[in-house]
Amino acid sequence: MESAVLNVARYDVFKLTEAVLAGQTARVLRMLDGLRAEGEAAVLVHWHVADTIAGLKRVKDALGQGKPLPVAFNEGRVWGVKQRLYERVLPLLAEHQLAHLVEAASICDGVVKGLKHPLWPLDPWDALRHLVLLLVQAVATPPAPRGKAPMLRAGPRLVLQA
C-alpha cells in the first residue's frame, strides 16, 4: 500500500512552465491533466503560465533596448533554471508573437475567472490548455526568416478531448 502511495505522480506548476518552455507538448498536457485531477486552482496555474509569458516579453524588450542578457534577466525577474530555457526560446519569438501571447494570457485570465470569450473554450482548464499550446507552439517552431515570423492566431475555439 505504501509503495502505491509513493508512486502517485505529483505535479507542480513550476515544472509545468519548465516543460512548456522546453516544448514538451505531451508532458505539458499530462501535467495539466494531473494538476486538474489533484485539485490545483486554475487561477494559480494561469498565474504561473502568464508570468512566464510576461517574463519572456520583459526580457525580449530589455534585449531590444540593447541591454546585456544578465541585465535583461534581472529586469525580467528570471532566475535559475528558467534562464537556460529562456536563452533557448527567446531567439524563436518575434515581438509580435510575444504581444499576441500576452493578449492570449489576458483573455485566458478572464475565462479562468468566469468571463466568456467567443474564440476561447468556456471551461477554465480547456482555456489553460489552449494557452499553453499557443506557447508551446511558439517555442517549438524554428525561427522564420528575418521579418517573417509566423503569427500565432487564436483562431476558432480549440476543443480537446481527454
PLM regions: where:
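Amphipathic alpha-helical interaction/assembly segments
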Residues: 37-60, 97-162
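Small-residue-rich helix-loop
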Residues: 1-101, 136, 158
